[in-house]
Design a protein with these regions (language model features):
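Gram-negative/organellar outer-membrane beta-barrel architecture
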Residues: 1-99
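C-terminal outer-membrane beta-barrel translocator/porin domains of Gram-negative envelope proteins
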Residues: 72-215
Length: 215
């Protein structure tokens, strides 16, 4: 993966690239077969700070992303599971310090378009995913550090969700489960076109006292 950020006055320009490959073997009805595939993703974003003071910051952003995925069974490409998606993004962010706590709000609109070699609309049947879609997202978070009995703690709460009236391809789904969303569900996930979750965490930070681990 690659990430580059360029601040320019009130603007910040970012570019990200990631790629992944997989290869595995499976078996069905006693017959083994090979599965493999790859994914490539480009992401460009321009963010403009609209207002900034000692306790808050407000910004808008525009983005463009392109993702290609290829999946194969015995070197035969699975057309219905291989995608070329180009997406435009419009975002709004407001962060504010309240006392010793921090509140952050993110609003987003994502739309699938036909640029950069994206796949066409085709003629999807009912229940088939669309390459031209609209998706709306909202994330609200709160962080509160505090001390108790001489120890350092922090509490953070995050509520996030997305909504789409279209059937989406899996990379555009919201996913529940794993370390990035709901704790305790590492090997179980739930995905969908629309949904959300609310996560609350309490952290306890303590200095390392064992001499061999001290810097």
């Amino acid at each position: 993966s690659l990430f580059y950020s360029l601040p320019w006055g009130w603007w910040t320009f970012t570019y990200g690239y990631s790629q992944s490959d997989y290869r595995t073997r499976n078996e069905a009805s006693g017959f083994p077969f090979k599965l493999d595939g790859d994914s490539r993703s480009h992401q460009f974003r321009a963010e403009r700070v609209l207002h900034r003071d000692g306790v808050s910051k407000t910004a808008m952003s525009l983005g463009l992303s392109h993702q290609r995925t290829n999946n194969y069974v015995e070197d035969t490409r699975l057309e219905d599971q291989s995608t070329r998606i180009t997406e435009t993004q419009l975002g709004f962010n407001h962060g504010r310090r309240i006392g010793s706590g921090f509140v952050n709000l993110d609003l987003g609109w994502q739309q699938g378009i036909g640029a950069l070699g994206a796949q066409g609309r085709g003629h999807p049947q009912a229940g088939d995913p669309h390459a031209r879609y609209d998706k709306y997202s909202l994330t609200l978070s709160y962080l509160q550090p505090f001390q108790l009995w001489g120890e350092r703690f922090s509490f953070d709460s995050l509520a996030t969700g997305q909504r789409s009236e279209d059937v989406l391809f899996s990379p555009q789904h919201i996913s529940l489960g794993g370390n990035s969303s709901v704790r305790g569900f590492k090997d179980q996930t739930l995905t969908g076109d629309s949904g959300g979750y609310w996560r609350n965490q309490l952290r306890w930070r303590r200095a390392v006292e064992w001499a061999p681990l001290r810097p």
